[in-house]
């Protein structure tokens, strides 16, 4: 029994080591520049040993992408457990958590949103995006101005938030006035643009 436990732990540790090394190589060399032999040298094992755990670089990449999104969703999970009275404030908090996660885990962020597999596959949105959409819908409420625009406004918010996250991770030496102030300005402006007009709409009978 103990021998089996040790073998299982060893397999888990080896798999994690392979994934960690693969993540850095994908970020450094891109999907097309990634080579399983390079990965084997990085881990310090034979090429055959890599294939015991993963059949191809495509499988490796898919696992890394899924792990990154799961990690991001966990970081945003606290918002899903809270039902605050101010959905706009909650939305801004979620967007800030997104940026903070990207800055704290830049390699995972690159895998999730920057490095691409050129093979054409149907794009599948993750639960993290679904959670953002739900918050935007809550902010918009029953505004007629927002009818049919939920997806547009959610995507616009993500585009702005992704933009500042990518810039901060890829241009850390740029003379930013203040990274936190820039983040706050981008998020506040994006939310005002996406939610503000809808919030100003008045229902019938309202003065």
Please report, for each region that a protein language model flagged, where it lies by residue.
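Hydrophobic alpha-helical connector segments
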Residues: 77-107, 129, 147, 154-157
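Solvent-exposed, non-membrane alpha-helical residues enriched in polar/charged side chains
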Residues: 15-16, 23, 27, 77, ...
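Helix-turn-helix
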Residues: 17, 21, 25-59, 63
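Amphipathic alpha-helical linker/stalk segments
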Residues: 64-91, 123, 132-134, 138-141
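Hydrophobic recognition helices of helix-based DNA-binding modules
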Residues: 68, 72, 76, 102, ...
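N-terminal intrinsically disordered/low-complexity leader segments
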Residues: 1-13, 24, 198-207
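Hydrophobic/aromatic-rich alpha-helical bundle segments in the mid-to-C-terminal region
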Residues: 110, 114, 121-122, 126-129, ...
